[in-house]
Amino acid sequence: MAQAKIIYDLVGGTDFSRAAPNIEGTALAVNCFTESNTEGDNKNVRTFLQSAPGVKYFDTFGQTDHCDGLYVPSTGLSAYDFEQCLFVAYNGEVFRVDSALNHEKIGIYALGNTVQFAESGGERAILMWVDGTDIHGYNLKTGETVNITLPKRIDAQNQYIQPTHIAVVDGSIVLNDKGSSFTYYSIKYPLNTAKRKVFKIVNGKVQYESDKITVSMTEVDSGVYCFLDDYGVQKYFNGSTSSDKCVAISSVGPLLTLFGPSSIEFWQKGNTESYQSWQRTSYTINKEQGLESPYSIASVNHQQFCIGTGKANAKCVLMIAGTEVRKISPLWLDRVLADNDVKSVVGWTYSKNNHSFYLFSIKNKCYVYDATTSQWHIRQSRNYYTGTVKNYMPLFAVWWNNRIITGSSESGHLYELDENYFYEDFDSENRLPLLRVRQTPVVTTNYKPFVIYELAIECNTGAMENYDRPAKALLEVSRDGGYTFGNVLESSCGRRGQYSYRLKWLNLGMNRQCVLRISYSEPTDFVMSDSEIRFKELSTPL
């Protein structure tokens, strides 16, 4: 006779299907993710589930709309000792924020569009941003506006390109053109000086000095000539093996990635011309997978992430490391992508404590990939007045003044992601404790009926700030594979200082299969490291 063995997983990621949860997966991790203590030599690996960071109010620009972009450049105003500032795109305006949280409007963008930032590099550091209609510039050291002239379309008469993405590789500024297959680029460091000397051209011919040897030069505005070489000719290229549109570009190190609806190409600088041309790297064309969501591209730790599409995997999430393109989304997430229009989805990333996260939202869920553990989890916020779940409030993230600062998906607020803060702030006054939920896969024991006498969880207890009441966790049990759940059962996590307390529930009834869902919304950390189920297998069928 086989030994009675119960199979369950209380510490893990998300693997959830609404279509057939009892067959395809019921596991959920909401506002919590898997961690392993692997530091030190000869240390046993122990996996546990820890809380996602709290959402702490930081600053505000308004109560409506949402953030359209964040950026922290490498330098700042010379008058303030080159202090790094935060740049925020909100409600059609771009603001510079200093360490004292003073706001200064420094530019505009097309209202309602997502903003992509880049920095020119070189001695004259210029912050640039594109919005799908135009390009804008700002001198980071002097605080002056820099006017930059867009290239004209190669395939149309007297029309300027409409860049949605911008990248800088080895000093060369690169733009895509919405609706076109062409990519436009500059010479190296074209904005390094306010004025630039170029060849004097009259009626298409280079002019010479009186000695008939020395080429005549003329001085021009570097912003006007940004995307022209010394002959006044535009620099551009298009896909060498694909004819689809270039809907986005991205750069990681020396590699430039071009994304089309049905292809991904990798380009790098060549040395065949005086200003270096671009050439497609060999063996790197991917014609079976393209880009579904132009603004889903985000990078962290030399890895790129995006929502792709194509005959290889249909709609899916892709991770690009170097020139390797790999699908990372599980089947349940592929179905979510397939069932929704995701063309306007925005992706963003951040990294903390050896974890690199890629995040994007669809409806009221934010799907998060942890590149360290290769697991997915979900992040959600709550409505302050009703307590019902809604989309995750943070959007975009930057590292500024030793903080992870984010924008907001529903207002002009800025937040800090703080791992030692266990609330969600809605503004400077209103907040709710962070809700964390862990739902197990289907629990079975040799696929026979069983009775659960006790569920005990090893977690941090005695962590409440006040002595007046204990922290409480809530348990719900589903006996139909995760479709519906029964009554809510409370259990104590101990009062302040009761560190030896154990979280447990007794007499959970008879089951053929069940799903356990634990919720915790106290303003303390909640870390689950292990669990135990005391049960008895039955011979009587249900």
Please report, for each region that a protein language model flagged, where it lies by residue:
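Hydrophobic or amphipathic alpha-helical targeting/insertion segments
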Residues: 116-151
